[in-house]
């Protein structure tokens, strides 16, 4: 790999390490609430090793190595470097790598799925390892995987048969995408939900589905049979269920939730925790699904939580979930504003560009809250969440939206933002946080929350008039496709689904944010149109920041595989293309001050005409969004793929010219140092916070001895 190619994989130096500030919100809880939050926090973080195993085979050993080195020198890294003969600069490089590693819970970026490697030379890491026998033993297990791979494809997560890395299919280097697809369809047919599974291909060519559970023989199972003979191209082979994947961790999680249940604050929480315990002890996704039914009924709790194998972005097939869990406190002041948005939703949704037949018969008002996060376990912390992901619960029972306030407000050092014109920097700095809050609210509440899937819910039963089907607004013809019995949005759209849905939700936000009555709900303006007032500034930055995100997205596109590595960023690139194609010079990219096409792109800037948002920007978004939505609603995968591939295609100018400049100017993503809680005898629960530094990040995990 040449130096230029290698540079994009080097660990951030320095990483942007910030505190997830929580103290005043935690201290406002009473003793019972603190204990409830404490045990949920511990349950969530007890899954850390699951996250590590879900990233790469070497991640768990690297994690242990970082903590072992810290313990061996009692956190005095300068002394460790001196005794190992390693310079202070190289020790700093190791600490920078360690902070990014722990912040991503593995050695592939949680946002982008590309590997990052230390800047410290390998012989210096070996020297650090030699200072401690346990560290040296660990080092020998991962030293060949710490740095760049000989095959560039292995620098990215993805399907093994495409040369990429995926530990959702452990010890199975020759497993094919067709085999993954075939077995996924079989499991769906048998009624086994795949979120809490991994799959291994054995040397004999048979398949083992590894189910996460605290026991190897659960008292009850979601499906009766555990062994299946295969047919078709795999005749003679078999598939069997193997319980007890992540057994130690699942037992710890179940034990902590058993303790949390003792402090549940109402009956919904009591029932929810009971289902969580069954889900993780027995490996039951059916129980997890039931936990979410109780969770959505627990409206506006003082202590909010969710936990499980939730998001499926990182499984290349898009069906297996990553471990995730959080404990958080409600921010009542911010939640009031979001509550008004929820109440106004029935008036806002009809403004979207599709007929009523493509919308739910009744909007299920979600619980929309702003949270201050105590703990978020997983590979990265989002700014907002819309769950559960189970289609039938979302369609028929409801869902919750949460905005993570202290994630949104976590401050990084102020500096000029790449690709923004000098004359836009001040308004961008002033409005980027409010604009992002508007975007997150609309994205999560109305974006993910709106829309109907046209379904044959069971043989011969439909959730629309099949005798007189609605007109497809894209084709002008009657609808001719829909979801068949047993099909879900995820099963039909597969690996493309997560990015496509994020694009749909982002587009809903772009469609609705030009509505000044909505901006007023968030506290901007009086509802009257004024593109040059405060509300107009927020609207302008909603659009400008989306265009900028589309350029920045190229960092997450791999030129070798020509593959997107991050669902949200692929979506934002598509929306930037919508802006660029809107016409009328609404949005243009200027290569240099004199617009010289042959200039280097160090002065590349976005020109977006705020006055043309209502005349060019929003109409272009609406036309794009209508197609996205209708293709999803009608299960039209072929049309959706052709359409989405067009907008997410990276041409040679973006690949060869723009992308290298994006990488050169890229700012490190934040990694968050989170507090710990400890039971303190009769004094209740102690909250311990740490400094925002690589050393503080490592210390916070060293003190989680239960992991």
Regions found by a protein language model. Name each.
Residues 8-11, 33, 42-43, 49-119, ...:
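Zinc-dependent metallohydrolase catalytic domains
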Residues 16, 27, 31, 56, ...:
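Soluble non-cytosolic domains of exported or imported proteins
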Residues 27, 34-39, 60, 64, ...:
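Solvent-exposed, polar/charged alpha-helical surfaces in well-ordered, non-transmembrane soluble domains
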Residues 95-98, 102-218, 225, 236-436:
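Contiguous, non-catalytic segments that form substrate-binding/exosite surfaces or channel walls
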Residues 442, 446-447:
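Short active-site segment of divalent metal-dependent hydrolases/proteases
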């Amino acid at each position: 790999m040449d130096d230029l190619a290698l540079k994009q994989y080097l660990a951030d130096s320095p990483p942007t390490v910030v505190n997830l500030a929580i103290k005043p919100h935690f201290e406002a809880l009473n003793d019972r609430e603190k204990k409830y939050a404490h045990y949920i926090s511990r349950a969530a973080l007890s899954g850390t090793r699951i996250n590590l195993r879900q990233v790469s085979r070497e991640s768990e050993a690297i994690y242990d190595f970082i903590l072992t080195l810290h313990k061996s020198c009692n956190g005095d890294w300068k002394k460790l470097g001196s005794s190992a003969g390693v310079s202070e600069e190289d020790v700093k490089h190791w600490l920078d790598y360690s902070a990014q590693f722990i912040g991503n819970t593995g050695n592939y970026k949680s946002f982008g799925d590309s590997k990052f490697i230390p800047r410290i030379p390998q012989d210096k890491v070996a020297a650090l390892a030699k200072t401690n026998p346990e560290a040296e033993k660990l080092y020998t297990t991962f030293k060949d995987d710490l740095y760049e791979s000989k095959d560039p494809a292995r620098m990215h997560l993805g399907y093994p048969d495409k040369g990429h890395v995926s530990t959702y299919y452990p010890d199975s280097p020759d497993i094919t995408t067709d085999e993954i697809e075939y077995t996924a369809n079989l499991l769906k047919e048998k009624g086994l939900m795949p979120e809490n599974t991994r799959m291994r291909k054995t040397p004999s060519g048979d398949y083992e589905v590894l189910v996460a559970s605290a026991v190897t023989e659960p008292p009850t199972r979601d499906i009766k049979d555990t062994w299946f003979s295969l047919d078709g191209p795999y005749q003679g082979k078999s598939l069997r269920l193997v319980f007890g994947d992540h057994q130690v961790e699942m037992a710890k999680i179940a034990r902590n939730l058993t303790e949390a249940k003792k402090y549940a604050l109402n009956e919904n929480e009591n029932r929810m925790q009971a289902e969580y315990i069954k889900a993780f002890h027995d490996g039951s996704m059916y129980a997890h699904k039931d936990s979410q039914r109780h969770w959505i009924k627990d409206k506006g709790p003082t202590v909010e939580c969710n936990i499980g194998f939730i998001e499926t972005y990182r499984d290349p097939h898009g069906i297996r979930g990553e471990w995730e869990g959080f404990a958080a406190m409600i921010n009542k002041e911010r939640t009031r504003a979001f509550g008004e948005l929820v109440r106004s939703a029935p008036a806002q949704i009809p403004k979207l560009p599709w007929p009523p037949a493509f919308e739910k018969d009744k909007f299920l008002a979600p619980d929309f809250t702003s949270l201050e996060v105590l703990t978020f376990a997983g590979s990265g912390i989002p700014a907002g969440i819309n769950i559960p992901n189970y289609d039938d619960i979302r369609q028929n029972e409801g869902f919750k939206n949460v905005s993570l306030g202290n994630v949104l407000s976590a401050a990084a050092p102020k500096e000029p933002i790449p690709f923004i014109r000098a004359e836009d920097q001040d308004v961008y700095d002033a409005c980027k946080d409010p604009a992002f809050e508007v975007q997150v609210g609309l994205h999560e509440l109305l974006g993910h929350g709106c829309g109907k899937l046209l379904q044959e819910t069971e043989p011969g039963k439909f959730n629309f008039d099949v005798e007189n089907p609605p007109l497809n607004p894209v084709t002008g013809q009657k609808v001719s496709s829909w979801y068949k019995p047993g099909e879900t949005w995820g099963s039909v759209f597969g690996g493309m689904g997560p990015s496509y849905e994020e694009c749909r939700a982002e587009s809903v936000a772009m469609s609705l944010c030009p509505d000044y009555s909505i901006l007023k709900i968030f506290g901007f303006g009086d509802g009257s149109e004024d593109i040059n007032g405060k509300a107009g500034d927020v609207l302008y930055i909603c659009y400008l920041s989306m265009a900028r995100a589309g350029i920045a997205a190229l960092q997450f596109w791999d030129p070798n595989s020509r593959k997107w590595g991050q669902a949200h960023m692929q979506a934002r690139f598509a929306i930037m293309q919508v802006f660029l194609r809107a016409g009328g010079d609404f949005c243009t990219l200027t290569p240099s001050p004199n617009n010289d096409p042959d200039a280097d792109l160090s002065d590349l800037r976005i020109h977006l005409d705020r006055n043309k948002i209502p005349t060019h920007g929003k109409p272009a978004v609406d036309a794009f969004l209508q197609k996205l939505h209708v293709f999803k609603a009608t299960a039209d995968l072929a049309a959706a793929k052709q359409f989405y591939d067009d907008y997410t295609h990276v041409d040679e100018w973006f690949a060869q010219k723009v992308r290298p400049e994006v990488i050169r100017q890229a700012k490190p993503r934040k990694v968050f140092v989170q507090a710990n809680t400890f039971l303190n005898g009769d004094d209740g629960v102690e909250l311990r916070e740490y400094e925002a530094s690589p050393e503080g990040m490592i210390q916070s995990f060293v003190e989680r001895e239960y992991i």
